[in-house]
């Protein structure tokens, strides 16, 4: 948990972490010259009191990850509304179909929050995976910049996993950016009251996902057909055409579990 020097908001509700009774964890803490060391049976965090850097270590003292001092920059949180006016709506055609745009929105400051940055130092051959579903086809995010925002087929998740055997779950529901280049490696958080993240240490990816599920709750599995091949096209013009698609896949022996009648099939103006 990282704050700006003000009061820690321990009681704030999380939209990510499951609300349940968590058992107490045995740990030890000691303060040496210039550092505080917190240990459990599996993980050790060494905090530099002067710089704010954190080194995450295995129980045997070998290093997992180095985190440099984070940044918190104060920012205004702005909401937009029409006040007492009736909304003036313009219907505009976009590449994603027709959209409603309200023309008479007014900006209103509702509170002050922070923009945050978590800086990390990865090992040279370390790979970083996760961050949800994107459209660029990036497997290993090392050397890449990835904007994490919700849109259509973009489904970001504030969690990453490393081939070094750990994961980072950031308790953040705002826009985020992952960046790794020659200058800096960081996670940018657009709007937070404080930075809360969970270090999930393990020996295998399964152990990391176990910890992730423990913190966020059990996810319901989709029906089996949803894991097969899904055929989607902007428009099928007739039922005959759609059925011929299915017959063709059956003929060539390619499993097909779902055919999507996409947006050009739907009634104009009745979808978002």
Question: Which residues fall in each region the model found?
Answer:
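Loop/turn elements at helix/coil->beta-strand transitions in domains of secreted/extracellular proteins
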Residues: 222-226, 252-257
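A short, structure-level motif marking secondary-structure boundaries and short turns
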Residues: 229-232, 270-272
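N-terminal accessory segment at the very beginning of proteins
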Residues: 1-225, 231-241, 245-247, 261
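Acidic/aromatic-lined carbohydrate-recognition and catalytic surfaces
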Residues: 261-272
């Amino acid at each position: 948990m990282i704050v700006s020097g003000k009061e820690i908001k321990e009681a704030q509700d999380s939209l990510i972490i499951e609300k349940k009774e968590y058992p107490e964890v045995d740990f030890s803490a000691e303060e040496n010259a210039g550092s505080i060391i917190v240990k459990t049976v599996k993980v050790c965090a060494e905090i530099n009191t002067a710089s704010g850097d954190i080194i995450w270590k295995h129980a045997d003292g070998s290093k997992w990850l180095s985190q440099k001092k984070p940044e918190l920059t104060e920012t205004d949180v702005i909401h937009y509304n029409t006040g007492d006016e009736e909304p003036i709506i313009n219907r505009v055609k976009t590449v994603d179909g027709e959209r409603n745009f309200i023309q008479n929105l007014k900006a209103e400051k509702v509170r002050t929050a922070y923009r945050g940055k978590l800086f990390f130092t990865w090992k040279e051959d370390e790979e970083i995976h996760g961050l949800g579903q994107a459209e660029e086809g990036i497997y290993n995010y090392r050397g890449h910049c990835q904007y994490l925002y919700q849109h259509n087929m973009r489904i970001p998740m504030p969690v990453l996993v490393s081939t070094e055997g750990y994961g980072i779950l950031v308790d953040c529901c705002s826009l985020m950016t992952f960046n790794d280049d020659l200058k800096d490696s960081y996670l940018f958080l657009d709007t937070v009251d404080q930075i809360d993240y969970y270090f999930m240490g393990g020996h295998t990816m399964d152990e990391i996902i176990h910890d992730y599920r423990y913190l966020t709750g059990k996810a319901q599995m989709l029906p089996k057909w949803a894991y097969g091949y899904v055929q989607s096209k902007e428009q099928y013009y007739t039922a005959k055409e759609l059925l011929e698609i299915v017959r063709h896949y059956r003929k060539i022996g390619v499993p097909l579990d779902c055919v999507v009648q996409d947006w050009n099939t739907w009634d104009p103006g009745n979808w978002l």
